[in-house]
């Protein structure tokens, strides 16, 4: 991927490439803080659509199988997928195969590199997109639904709604009160580590900021990198901003900032970057030239002691190493907002494009994806998330997954992630991706001028 050609309308030039990954509101109970990113996903034709040249290739459509209880839908559908890494790609293919076997509806899967998918989504949806596509809950969903680029699936929700909590339904609802999204799973952003390393070195789980830094000092003395970090893709640093802002200034301020109701020039925002400076000595150097996957390997390989990322980082571990992974919540910072236990816990799922060639087939696919059956099939191969559907079988959850469910359930303030909680043109490589990379590249720069530049960029968009 290369930088977008649109010039940066600021005095600070972003550092690095354009990509974003990923990715409910307070207590998963409202929709005001649910999210956005975007870019421009090269328009694909319907049918077996080819991936853009920057993408990750195309997955072959599975063959039809068996008699279909939904034979009235019939035919085939197309599915644009951002599950490009091997583990989720194979897990999604297993879901597609099960759907075809159950309904007789064939699915032509167009798999595109995850970051490319995000960056190209706007033009993709405005062109001739696939019938169905992977996407995200919250503002990102509402943004495109509000532009008329997604199909209202409220009729599907009238059938499957009892299989979801009210919070998941709220996260799937557009500004017009209609439903446009099927939640599939979610996952928390946490500090991941290897149990065997902590046992070998006698490390304790840090509860407070001072404990966290003291552990970092100990790890450095032991010849370890305390915190793995890779931000060449532009989005991982957003998680650090989110957690520091929520823990220092509270969930409401954070979501207000994402919505433009608070100012980037507020001294509260400067305090986030000042706190971040305290963390920098413990972070893996050269982050702007490292992918999140390579950073994960540093933690898995025990060159780094910890890694703050979504639990999907576990996809990078071998089956033999996976049981050795554990995590703990980001430490408290000693503020009035510690009790919120605010975290990012993004919801991933699916939508139907504005004018699918096979609307009934697309809706049948949504019905299937809304079942515990489909979600359990996915989680069998990708046990780094927790299912969204009420009827999902959680008895087979690993201790890792059980702990994920507990930490999500115990949080009183759940955000979706920076690039899902704000408008797409502000979150992208010309916006916060680039601005955060600029800070990482030059953390001692004048914060007053830096934050004014971010505010000026926001003001230029609204």
Which residues does each PLM region occupy?
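Extracytoplasmic/periplasmic substrate-recognition and gating elements
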Residues: 97-102, 200-201, 274, 281-284, ...
């Amino acid at each position: 991927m290369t930088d977008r050609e649109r010039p940066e309308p600021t005095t600070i030039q972003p550092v690095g490439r354009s990509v974003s990954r990923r990715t409910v509101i307070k207590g998963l109970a409202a929709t005001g803080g649910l999210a956005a990113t975007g870019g421009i996903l090269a328009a694909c034709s319907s049918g077996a659509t080819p991936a853009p040249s920057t993408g990750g290739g195309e997955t072959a459509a599975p063959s039809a199988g068996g008699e279909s209880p939904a034979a009235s839908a019939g035919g085939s559908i197309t599915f644009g997928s951002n599950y490009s890494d091997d583990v989720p790609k194979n897990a999604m293919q297993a879901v597609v195969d099960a759907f075809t076997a159950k309904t007789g509806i064939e699915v032509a899967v167009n798999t595109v590199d995850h970051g490319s998918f995000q960056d190209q989504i706007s033009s993709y949806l405005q062109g001739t997109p696939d019938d169905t596509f992977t996407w995200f809950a919250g503002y990102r969903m509402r943004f495109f639904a509000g532009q008329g680029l997604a199909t209202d699936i409220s009729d599907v929700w009238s059938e499957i709604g009892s299989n979801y909590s009210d919070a998941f339904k709220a996260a799937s609802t557009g500004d017009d009160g209609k439903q446009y999204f099927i939640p599939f799973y979610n996952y928390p952003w946490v500090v991941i580590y290897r149990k065997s390393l902590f046992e070998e070195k006698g490390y304790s789980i840090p509860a407070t900021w001072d404990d966290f830094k003291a552990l970092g000092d100990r790890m450095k003395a032991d010849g370890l990198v305390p915190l793995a970090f890779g931000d060449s893709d532009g989005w991982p640093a957003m998680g650090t901003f989110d957690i520091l802002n929520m823990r220092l200034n509270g969930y409401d301020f954070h979501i207000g900032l994402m919505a433009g109701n608070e100012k980037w020039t507020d001294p509260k925002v400067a305090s986030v970057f000042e706190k971040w400076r305290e963390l920098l000595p413990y972070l893996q150097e050269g982050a702007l030239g490292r992918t999140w996957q390579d950073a994960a390997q540093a933690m898995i390989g025990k060159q780094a002691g910890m890694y703050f990322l979504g639990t999907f980082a576990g996809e990078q571990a071998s089956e033999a190493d996976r049981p050795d992974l554990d995590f703990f919540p980001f430490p408290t910072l000693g503020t009035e907002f510690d009790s919120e236990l605010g975290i990012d816990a993004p919801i991933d799922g699916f939508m139907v494009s504005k004018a699918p060639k096979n609307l009934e087939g697309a809706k049948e696919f949504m019905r299937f994806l809304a079942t515990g059956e489909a979600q359990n099939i996915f989680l069998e191969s990708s046990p780094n998330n927790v299912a969204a559907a009420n009827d999902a079988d959680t008895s087979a959850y690993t201790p890792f997954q059980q702990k994920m469910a507990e930490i999500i359930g115990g949080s009183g303030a759940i955000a979706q992630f920076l690039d899902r909680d704000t408008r797409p043109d502000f979150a992208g490589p010309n916006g916060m991706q680039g601005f955060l990379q600029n800070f990482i590249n030059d953390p001692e720069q004048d914060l007053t001028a830096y934050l004014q530049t971010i505010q000026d960029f926001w003001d230029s968009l609204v």
